[in-house]
Every structure is written in structure tokens, then in C-alpha cells.
Design a protein with these regions (language model features):
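Short, gly/Ser/Thr-rich active-site loops of penicillin-recognizing serine hydrolases
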Residues: 112-116, 129, 216-230
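Beta-lactam-recognizing serine transpeptidase/beta-lactamase-like catalytic domain environment
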Residues: 1-201
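Short amphipathic alpha-helical face segments that pack within enzyme cores
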Residues: 84-90, 213-220
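Short beta-strands and strand-coil junctions in structured, solvent-facing domains, enriched
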Residues: 208-209
Length: 230
């Protein structure tokens, strides 16, 4: 399984191994430079910074040393990691706009404000966007339900664990698990058609699987957007 297929099929084990090789310092440094763990500056009150953990944070917060197992779960965005939909949207926007991390705006006709650049080479940024497109177009891609005629969609599904489930619940279907214990469902995406481009990020709290819960919402949004454009 190569990196593109690991992204397309959402293979946690691949990223466990990659995270172990990179180490928590490299992971946390990249995430912060990519805009996570800090406010985006959107003109809304009470924006959350989210959290990108590292060894120093854990020692200060809990008085305990960092454990190797915490690195591998951080590598897939679990554990102590918290992010917001607008942070994810800004990151995806940077993937498709040349690497510019923009301050999110609610007003129309406002000139974009570049805050910083993604800390990656263009070839790596383009590889990620192509892998997200592959996630939609591949027969085994977790976002294959987003395929549309006359439009190019790229996406990444996500499932964020809320709590560690007890043996009583861990093998149950989502609908059989108490609501507040269910995973959060994510889908981050971009879409192109003619001269129009969009970023759509959906979080369904306690929604279970990203592909089955957030996916249909994302597709409905694109169908509306592209109908409006035409």
C-alpha cells in the first residue's frame, strides 16, 4: 500500500508507522505551521485555537512524559488533538490555491489576506490534492460517493473518536451506541467546475463514519453549488 492508496482508503496503520518515523516534534511543528493550534482570525467571537500536543505541552499539563503510543494516535488526528472546521477549510483551501493560508472572511468582495504559506513544496501539495481526487475516483476510495459528472471533487473522510468505548459497546453498530459516545464524522473536500472552485468541510457531531454520514451532506452541497453556477 503506497501513500496515495493509504490516503484514499484511509489506512490508519500506514499513518501509525509514518508518525512513528517522523516523531511528535516534527508532527507538531508542521501542524502549527500549517495553521492548526491557533486561531484563524475569522471575524466571529470566541474562536477556539484547537490543540496540537507535544512533549512540552503534556509535561506542563499533566506533569507526565510523552509516550510513544501518543505519537501514533496524534499522527491520525486522535488523542489530544482538537481542530475546528474552519481550520480544516483554510488548510484545504491552501492546498488548491498555491499554498496560501488565508484569513477566513464572512463578507463578500473582500480582498484575500494571506497570513502565511503552507510549509511544504508545491510537488507535495499537488500530490495531496491528487490523492484526495483519487479518494473520490478510486473504486476503493472512502469518498467515492462524491463522484459527479462534469466536476472534479477531491476529499478526505475522517472519524474522530470521542471516548474509548468499553467492551460493551466497541463492536456495536453506530446506532446501537449511546449518542454522546458516538464518533464524530468529518469530510473535508474541494470541488472544481469550469472556473468555479469551492471548499466544503462538514462535521457531524456524534455522526459516526465520515463517509456515510458527512459524505451525503457534502454531495448535496456540491450539487446545489454547481446547479447554481450553471
Amino acid at each position: 500500500l503506497d501513500l496515495q492508496e493509504a490516503i484514499s482508503q484511509s489506512c490508519d496503520v500506514y499513518f501509525y508507522n509514518l508518525g512513528e518515523q517522523l516523531g511528535i516534534s516534527n508532527i507538531s511543528q508542521f501542524a502549527r505551521e500549517a495553521g492548526f493550534g491557533q486561531r484563524t482570525g475569522i471575524n466571529l467571537p470566541n474562536e477556539s485555537k484547537g490543540l496540537i500536543p507535544d512533549k512540552d505541552w503534556k509535561l506542563k499539563r499533566f506533569g507526565q512524559p510523552w509516550q510513544g503510543g501518543e505519537t501514533v494516535i496524534t499522527a491520525i488526528g486522535q488523542g489530544y488533538v482538537t481542530t475546528t472546521p474552519v481550520q480544516i477549510a483554510r488548510f484545504v483551501s491552501a492546498l488548491i490555491n498555491g499554498g496560501h493560508l488565508l484569513r477566513p472572511q464572512l463578507e463578500l468582495n473582500v480582498s484575500p489576506e494571506v497570513q502565511s504559506m503552507l510549509p511544504m513544496e508545491d510537488k507535495h501539495r499537488k500530490f495531496i490534492t491528487q490523492s484526495m481526487i483519487h479518494t473520490v475516483q478510486s473504486k476503493r476510495g472512502t469518498a467515492r460517493s462524491l463522484r459527479m459528472q462534469n466536476a472534479t471533487i477531491g476529499a478526505k473522510t475522517g472519524t474522530a473518536q470521542v471516548v474509548r468505548l468499553s467492551e460493551e459497546h466497541e463492536n456495536k453498530d453506530t446506532e446501537d451506541i449511546p449518542y454522546l459516545l458516538r464518533d464524530h464524522a468529518w469530510m473535508a473536500s474541494f470541488g472544481f467546475r469550469d472556473n468555479a472552485s469551492y471548499v466544503v468541510v462538514v462535521l457531524v457531531e456524534h455522526g459516526g463514519s465520515g463517509s456515510s454520514t458527512a459524505g451525503p451532506i457534502v454531495k448535496d452541497i456540491y450539487e446545489y453549488l454547481f446547479i447554481e453556477d450553471s
